[in-house]
Every structure is written in C-alpha cells, then in structure tokens.
Design a protein with these regions (language model features):
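An alpha-helical support segment within catalytic cores of ATP-dependent transferases
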Residues: 1-12, 117-182, 241, 279-296
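ATP-binding pocket architecture of kinase catalytic cores
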Residues: 14-133
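Conserved catalytic motifs of the protein kinase core domain
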Residues: 32, 78, 175-177, 195
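Active-site Asp-x-Gly
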Residues: 46, 177-179, 185-186, 190-244
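Short strand-connecting beta-turns/loops that link adjacent beta-strands
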Residues: 76-78, 193-195, 254-257
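Helix-rich C-terminal or lid/interface subdomains of diverse kinases
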Residues: 215-296
Length: 296
C-alpha cells in the first residue's frame, strides 16, 4: 500500500528508554501532524509489526470490526505501518467523566464484533491458530518475589489469590476460543466527548478466551469500583448471547494487576496509579469483595 503524500513529512520519535530486550525494540512516532508510524529495529519486534499489519487488513474486510485505525500505508520492505492520527484522549484520562454504561456499550460493541466466529475463522486463515501473546507474570513469580514489596500479611493474601487463580484457570474452558486484541488497556483506546474513536495496537492479537481480554477492566485506572467491567459484561452478553465468567476474568486479573506492580517495582518505574504495592493489594481485595468473590 503506497502513500506518496507522506514523503518528506517529519517524524517525531519519542524517548525509547527501557527497550534493551529485542522483543520490545519497536516504537510509534508522529509523522507530521496527521499520521502515526509504527516501526521496529529488531527481527523479534518486526514480527509484531508485521502481525499487526496482517490483522488490521483482515479486520477491515466487510463486515469490518468497528473502531479500527485507518491504515494509510503499510509495507514489508521496509517494514512500516502508517495510520491516520485520531484526536482524543486515553480512556485512563477520561474514564471518571464518562457514564459507565455508555462506555461499556461501545466497548462491548467492539468486543462482540472482534470475538465473532466469522472473525476467528478469517484470522485463522490469515495467521493460523496463533495464541494471543502478552507476558503476564506467572503465579510462581508472584509467590516468590512479590513478598519483597509488601507486608507478610499482604503477601499471604497474594499467595491465596494465586492458588485460587491457578485453580480457576485450570478448569476446562467450555467454549471455542475467539480472536482477542490481547492488550486492551486504556492507553490503547482513543476517546473524545465520551465516544470511543479508535482502538489501537493489535500486535498482541491472537486466539484466546474473552475473559482474558477483560483482565484489565477491573483496574487500576479504570475508574472507582468495578462498574465498567460489570456493565461491559452485561452488554457483551446482550450482543453475543454468551455470559462471561467473572471468576475467570478476575483470575486473569490477579496475574495482570499484580504482575504489573511486580515488574514496575523491580524495574524502578512508578506504578501506573503512582501509589504503592500495598495500596494495589488493598485495591485488588476491594474489587474481589465488590464482585462477591470470597477466597479463603
């Protein structure tokens, strides 16, 4: 896909700290004022950019999945993906000012389309039965290393949650897998005036369970409480006829939320909400209580 109008536009490259691992040697940069370019400088990272190009091309086939970025140019020699810039704000920054039900209805519309059987079949024809990839912390790592960040009592709770998550996720999954985005957090969404404009960054997309997709919706930074999660689950069931398991979502969430705290703390990076590991444990305990999940 060629776009000669892009020639000569300045590229603004962001700071690239913390990308010593070849897997992460890719970046997104502004191309002029109206475009965004995705590129990589290692073979490992290039596979993710190429994967996203193929996924977006497949998802744009009618009936297209809503809220996709507009691909302006894509190529493999050199490997590059250019999309049209969409004005707006991360969900993380606006979630407190958006009605939970209104936001959930839009998110469920995107998820219902992405998770459809038709999209899964198209994806398997393009990329094969590739599982979604994201480096979630293992429960073993959380048991062994999280205790250095919190009190003994808090680590006891973390250990119980890990045991519970292992037990829940070991149960046979009764439904076919779907194509999941794989990394659907607030910064991968652009919102404007309470309306979802676009969902970004499909390089982790692959087969998985819908509950895995929603592992970040309980928080942190998704607003107080778990209303966005429960409203999204409700609208998702209305659109798809498929009720999601809140236990499986929260089992994935244990690994997601605590794993994020672990790697940020060990890397010397502030937590996403700029609070402490102990506060993150308290927040997770509150979410579990609000969802009536009692882990002994």
């Amino acid at each position: 896909m060629a776009a000669p109008d892009l020639a000569g536009l300045p590229v603004t490259i962001p700071s690239l700290a913390g990308q010593d691992d070849p897997v992460w040697q890719m970046s997104t940069a502004a191309l002029g004022e109206d475009y965004i370019v995705k590129f990589a400088w290692s073979r490992a990272a290039a596979r993710f950019v190429l994967h996203q190009i193929r996924i977006l091309e497949m998802l744009a086939v009618e009936p297209a999945v809503p809220y996709l970025p507009e691909v302006v140019a894509a190529g493999t020699s050199p490997l590059i993906l250019v999309t049209r810039r969409v004005r707006g704000t991360s969900l993380f920054k606006v979630v407190d000012g958006i009605g939970r039900d209104h936001a959930a209805r839009q998110l469920a519309r995107f998820l219902a389309a992405l998770h459809s059987d038709q999209v899964r079949r198209r994806a398997e024809a393009v990329i094969g039965p590739v599982p979604a990839w994201y480096p979630l912390a293992t429960t073993t790592a959380l048991r062994e290393r999280f205790g250095a960040l919190v009190t003994r009592e808090e680590q006891h709770s973390v250990g119980r949650w890990c045991d519970w998550a292992d037990e829940i996720l070991a149960r046979p999954y009764p439904f076919p897998q779907v194509l999941v985005h794989g990394d659907l957090h607030g910064d991968n969404q652009v919102w404007s005036a309470a309306e979802l404009q676009v969902v970004l960054d499909f390089e982790n997309a692959g087969l998985g369970e819908p509950e895995y997709e929603l592992r970040g919706f309980p928080g942190p930074d998704m607003g107080p409480g778990v209303e966005l999660l429960t409203a999204t689950m409700r609208h998702y069931e209305r659109l798809t006829g498929r009720a999601l398991s809140v236990e499986r979502i929260m089992a994935w969430h244990v690994r997601h939320a605590l794993g994020d705290v672990l790697w940020r703390s060990e890397a010397g990076i502030p937590l996403a909400d700029h609070r402490s590991p102990s506060a993150s444990v308290d927040d997770l305990a509150a979410r579990l209580r609000e969802l009536n999940i009692n882990i002994r």
